[in-house]
């Protein structure tokens, strides 16, 4: 069936509402909404919760942009898209908790369609979610990956292992030779077997994010932390910034398409520190993280 961009847009708007409601219920603070328009076509609504009881910053962004020609970042690996008009829409979010024992989480679901008269539309879905812990809790990693595996199961036995591997490969800091976190799911260019099946899978991933993340938040939010844990959290947040500014395709796409810079960089942690050649104390919980984030089968 023909791709229905309007149906996707309605789902994405309701997903943003749903995720914001669930995060606000856990935190107690409210999101502030900022609606924006893009001069070249489209717009979005950015929602940010700041300095809450649980989340130092949570940003949940919906955007829908369209234009007459594709940006260089998109046509580089898809030359057949040159000369087509395009629509790109998605929900993207990053949650930076205050408590260092709660991991940072990221999720994104998106839809893209490029058209030109007299030709079949080129379309695909993409998305996923991934987790960036500061302290190693095996049960959290297992729960996160079990949720990911279970939502993939109806779509085939090979779906979870394939998208887990893609996530591990994508969220990798080449210049540090380390993973960004413990991964999750990542998929892109999804357009088979048909529009409806792909759309259903994207919906499952979008809805699965809170099922994966919120039980971990509940488990960790009352844990007592101090200056040492905070110092380590801010240091490790530096890796998050490095990945987003150096390697992330979505950031590059947004900036190249004249997206709204404030919304694109909403994923940045509010506070972060770099320290020259810092090393954790041997045998410490901080030292355990480097082993913990290495790629492995969690379920």
Swiss-Prot record:
<dbReference type="GO" id="GO:0005737">
    <property type="term" value="C:cytoplasm"/>
</dbReference>
<feature type="binding site">
    <location>
        <position position="145"/>
    </location>
    <ligand>
        <name>a divalent metal cation</name>
    </ligand>
</feature>
<feature type="active site" description="Proton donor">
    <location>
        <position position="106"/>
    </location>
</feature>
<comment type="similarity">
    <text>Belongs to the aerobic coproporphyrinogen-III oxidase family.</text>
</comment>
<feature type="binding site">
    <location>
        <position position="106"/>
    </location>
    <ligand>
        <name>a divalent metal cation</name>
    </ligand>
</feature>
<dbReference type="InterPro" id="IPR036406">
    <property type="entry name" value="Coprogen_oxidase_aer_sf"/>
</dbReference>
<dbReference type="GO" id="GO:0004109">
    <property type="term" value="F:coproporphyrinogen oxidase activity"/>
</dbReference>
<dbReference type="GO" id="GO:0006782">
    <property type="term" value="P:protoporphyrinogen IX biosynthetic process"/>
</dbReference>
<dbReference type="GO" id="GO:0046872">
    <property type="term" value="F:metal ion binding"/>
</dbReference>
<feature type="binding site">
    <location>
        <begin position="258"/>
        <end position="260"/>
    </location>
    <ligand>
        <name>substrate</name>
    </ligand>
</feature>
<dbReference type="InterPro" id="IPR018375">
    <property type="entry name" value="Coprogen_oxidase_CS"/>
</dbReference>
<feature type="binding site">
    <location>
        <position position="96"/>
    </location>
    <ligand>
        <name>a divalent metal cation</name>
    </ligand>
</feature>
<feature type="binding site">
    <location>
        <position position="175"/>
    </location>
    <ligand>
        <name>a divalent metal cation</name>
    </ligand>
</feature>
<comment type="function">
    <text>Involved in the heme biosynthesis. Catalyzes the aerobic oxidative decarboxylation of propionate groups of rings A and B of coproporphyrinogen-III to yield the vinyl groups in protoporphyrinogen-IX.</text>
</comment>
<comment type="pathway">
    <text>Porphyrin-containing compound metabolism; protoporphyrin-IX biosynthesis; protoporphyrinogen-IX from coproporphyrinogen-III (O2 route): step 1/1.</text>
</comment>
<keyword id="KW-0963">Cytoplasm</keyword>
<dbReference type="GO" id="GO:0042803">
    <property type="term" value="F:protein homodimerization activity"/>
</dbReference>
<dbReference type="Pfam" id="PF01218">
    <property type="entry name" value="Coprogen_oxidas"/>
</dbReference>
<keyword id="KW-0479">Metal-binding</keyword>
<dbReference type="InterPro" id="IPR001260">
    <property type="entry name" value="Coprogen_oxidase_aer"/>
</dbReference>
<protein>
    <recommendedName>
        <fullName>Oxygen-dependent coproporphyrinogen-III oxidase</fullName>
        <ecNumber>1.3.3.3</ecNumber>
    </recommendedName>
</protein>
<comment type="subunit">
    <text>Homodimer.</text>
</comment>
<feature type="binding site">
    <location>
        <begin position="108"/>
        <end position="110"/>
    </location>
    <ligand>
        <name>substrate</name>
    </ligand>
</feature>
<feature type="site" description="Important for dimerization">
    <location>
        <position position="175"/>
    </location>
</feature>
<feature type="region of interest" description="Important for dimerization">
    <location>
        <begin position="240"/>
        <end position="275"/>
    </location>
</feature>
<keyword id="KW-0560">Oxidoreductase</keyword>
<keyword id="KW-0627">Porphyrin biosynthesis</keyword>
<feature type="binding site">
    <location>
        <position position="92"/>
    </location>
    <ligand>
        <name>substrate</name>
    </ligand>
</feature>
<keyword id="KW-0350">Heme biosynthesis</keyword>
